[in-house]
Amino acid sequence: MTRLYISGPVTGIENDNIQAFEDARRKLRRYYMVDIPHEYVYAGAPHEEAMAILLHQLTDRTYSYRKGKRANLYEGVALLPGWEQSEGARLERAVAEACGIPCKTVDEWLEEAR
């Protein structure tokens, strides 16, 4: 099953926008394994620390028995609405694409799976 990382705006949004991330995860879980950044970064972490943790997580490579080689932990990034205005989400997208990880909106991933 494809594993996705959800990226979107967090900083400056009430409760770190966790409701939007949880809503997206709930929709995507029908078709994908899904992680959200809130699982890896503690509430109130400085932005620089959060980004270091999340970029490390996003670019992690592990041995894939299915593929018989080391592969990206995530096979895709699902972008929440508003990602374009988020410095962190834009950086996550750029890094993911540089690592060959496809990035699409949540709706695009859902449409592809149906």
Predicted features by range, described:
Residues 1-114:
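Conserved catalytic or regulatory cores that recognize and/or transform ribose-phosphate-containing ligands
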